[in-house]
Amino acid sequence: MATRTQSNTEGHGRDGEKHMIFSALMTLAIAVSVSITPLQSAIWQVETSQCKSDCPKGDNGAAIGPLQIHRACWEDVKRDGENYSDCEGLDYSIQIFQRYMLRYATEKRLKRCVTDQDRARIWNGGPNGYKRQSTEVYWEKVQNALLE
């Protein structure tokens, strides 16, 4: 019986090897998730009370997922092969947040050190949200969530 199993395994050679590698990579992918900073956690709290899945659509259906991502935000930082519906997942939402911050919340762009207030207000109000008075209330909510 052992010989038969061996020969079956040998007969599948590369397929068996590929399956083992694929399984190992999938296990690793599941185990590794995006780490969440206190600011991201606070924004998540403000946006959806830390909803993890099947989050309600916000802004009259214009924003989706745990971080309430608008299509325009996603379009700014998406990569080939990604879909807007991926924003429904927390890990992907965090990646979009990080990419958006890397693009818009930079010292070079703001011409000064970037603060959590800048990041939160940019997230809420777009690339120039850090300047908009309309994002001040949002920052207060995020700040309160940071203190909880």
Predicted regions and their residues:
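Short N-proximal segments of mature Sec-exported proteins
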Residues: P56-E75
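Alpha-helical segment that forms one wall of the substrate-binding/catalytic cleft
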Residues: R71-Y130, W139-L147
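Sec-dependent N-terminal signal peptides
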Residues: F22-A31
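Short, low-complexity, charge-dense intrinsically disordered segments
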Residues: T3-E17
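Extracellular/periplasmic catalytic domains that process cell-envelope and extracellular macromolecules
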Residues: V34-T37, N60-A62, C113-D116
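Short, solvent-exposed loop/turn and secondary-structure capping segments
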Residues: D54-P56, S134-T135
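Short, functionally critical alpha-helical segments immediately adjacent to catalytic or ligand/cofactor-binding
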Residues: S35-K52, I69, F97, D118-P127
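Short, solvent-exposed loop/turn elements at domain surfaces
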Residues: C51-C55, D76-R79
